[in-house]
């Protein structure tokens, strides 16, 4: 198909990257044109064979900028899907914009000032892009419900649970949820007693709004989040569980299909729904 969307995947051998490659491979309107991963000893290997998908005629490379340069030259309108590491995601996003490859960033860990800088850089390049902390439609619905409930409850805490290989804490999804709840401009969790932590950090991370965020890391988990609200005589709990990374693929493909139509760098899947 001549109208397929060219896709480069960074973090191709990671858990999310592998799922993205499978999804792109089976999507009739997408074409995998690049696969980047820093795993030692895999350079030049066919990514399809590496993932048990059969030969895809796309060789693994560790050369991030080289892959972007090649995609921009041979596949105009290419999209980068990045699931790598918080330490490199800023540079990856900036490089994609510089090469004219539209970024779809699933890697979390970007600081607010970094997001602002990237948005400005994209605007100067007249490009769009998307930074998506969570590609689950169910999680977007939870976030919207949490923002609505925050109007009526003055006490709330957030708990996020992930696998023990996740590098950043709290998760970008949890931070995004808190930000949506804070758009009301209210303060949460007014102290009724003077608290004393006998173990530092026991009460979680404290945001200026008074919201507390708690992070749990355990093997066997994928991605889970709760928002707990408390009122006189009641507790209201919102929870979302992801048991398999396949749950994210509809959101990933939706973003890949829409991102080139954007005129700016956007943050959050809700901006595309």
UniProtKB/Swiss-Prot annotation:
One of its GO terms (biological process) is lysine biosynthetic process via diaminopimelate. It is found in: Cytoplasm. The keyword Oxidoreductase applies. The gene is dapB. (S)-2,3,4,5-tetrahydrodipicolinate binds at residues 163, 172-173. GO terms for molecular function: 4-hydroxy-tetrahydrodipicolinate reductase; NAD binding; NADP binding; oxidoreductase activity, acting on CH or CH2 groups, NAD or NADP as acceptor. The active site is at residues 162, 166. It catalyses: (S)-2,3,4,5-tetrahydrodipicolinate + NAD(+) + H2O = (2S,4S)-4-hydroxy-2,3,4,5-tetrahydrodipicolinate + NADH + H(+); (S)-2,3,4,5-tetrahydrodipicolinate + NADP(+) + H2O = (2S,4S)-4-hydroxy-2,3,4,5-tetrahydrodipicolinate + NADPH + H(+). This is 4-hydroxy-tetrahydrodipicolinate reductase.
